[in-house]
Amino acid sequence: MKCAALITEYNPFHNGHVYHAQQARQIADADVTIAIMSGQFVMRGEPAVYNKFIRTQMALSTCDLVVELPAYAALSAGEYFAEFGVKVADYMNADALVFGSESGSIQAFEELALQINHIEEHPEFQIKLREGKSYPRIISELLGEPPLLQTPNNILGLSYVQAILKSAPTIQPFSIQRHKTEHHNQAISDNHFASGTAIRHALNTEDKMWEQVVPNSIHELYAKPHMNTNQLFPYLKYKILSTSSDDLRAIHTISEGFEHRLKSSISTSDNFEQLMNQLKTKRYTYTRIQRMLMNVLLNFKQQDKPTTLNAVRILGMNETGQRYLKQLKQDFPERRFITNVNKTTAPYFKPEIKATEIYNLISGQTQTDFNTPVIRVKNKEK
């Protein structure tokens, strides 16, 4: 069976994601599509609006198999996010990786990726990296701001192609052009497509406009409890106040003395917005700060950051996905494809289990990694 992988967040799932999965199946001539999905926390540095089990059910309306992107990767910048997304795709023996971009031209990505992979070996690149500059900024300084690196999905797409060239050359990358919805636009203006930002805003303001940009088949899932990020601030404040500067410095993604800025800002902040206003500088993007804060909340330490992939958590599958998984287990008996978390398999997923526990503490939800078995559904018309 030919497999196309999609690295996703589905925060939450909407018509744009349906289009992505359908195009991936077509462009890669795939028999099966795998969604490699962030779990309880996402790359923008927030808890996902719906928990990973609800989002898995949403994804199975279109995809055949849903697996979890490791939690450390989900709360990392594009390079590490992409690196582990590609590791999971390779572990699942994907033939293709299909991503959305503003460009849509895979040739442009491949040419620039080769150029950048050579630049990374340059001493000046390493110096700038040690100075704490972001990866896209370093590339722009050394290459004169390539046009391809002017939009967020292009930047992430480039990271995917780089990761494939470095560690998974058997995977063929494809890019499809995204529908033009402004990524940070909070209004739903199109009658078919909208950004995740706009849909989350609609959910939090009880605006039913989301119904026109979400598949009818999953409307009932949207009625399930969802997370409001305002709920997390008291837990975050307690964590920062009760953690020493030395221990904060050891947290994944914390750098350049940012722990001191955290300690000095938290006492005078009464809510998340106030804290962000105090922490924001030209040096740090809003998203980068939020990722730091979520890593603090979860106590994700830099020394525990995974470098290898020892198992993959299977969150859900339809009948096609189940056949593909059976084939994988036969072809790769040494690999661990985990469908249920128990005492034996839990050690492979400690960060993910912790993320679910904290997510539930904040939201009051009760679905855990231990009491939620792999989700199985019947095939649907694609």
UniProtKB/Swiss-Prot annotation:
Q: What is its EC number?
A: 6.3.4.-
Q: Which GO terms describe its molecular function?
A: ATP binding; ligase activity, forming carbon-nitrogen bonds; tRNA binding
User: What's its top-level EC category?
Assistant: ligase
Which residues are ATP-binding? 7-20, 100, 153, 178
| The keyword Membrane appears for this protein | no
One Pfam match = HIGH_NTase1
Q: Name one GO biological process term.
A: tRNA modification
Name the reaction it catalyses.
cytidine(34) in elongator tRNA(Met) + acetate + ATP = N(4)-acetylcytidine(34) in elongator tRNA(Met) + AMP + diphosphate
Compartments (UniProt record): Cytoplasm
**InterPro entries associated with the record:** Cyt_trans-like, Rossmann-like_a/b/a_fold, tRNA(Met)_cyd_acetate_ligase
Q: Alphabetically list the UniProt keywords.
A: ATP-binding, Cytoplasm, Ligase, Nucleotide-binding, RNA-binding, tRNA processing, tRNA-binding
One Gene Ontology cellular component term attached to this UniProt record is: cytoplasm
Where does this chain mainly localize? cytoplasm
Q: Does the keyword Nucleotide-binding apply?
A: yes
This molecule's function is given as: Catalyzes the formation of N(4)-acetylcytidine (ac(4)C) at the wobble position of elongator tRNA(Met), using acetate and ATP as substrates. First activates an acetate ion to form acetyladenylate (Ac-AMP) and then transfers the acetyl group to tRNA to form ac(4)C34.
Specify the protein name: tRNA(Met) cytidine acetate ligase
UniProt organism field: Staphylococcus carnosus (strain TM300)
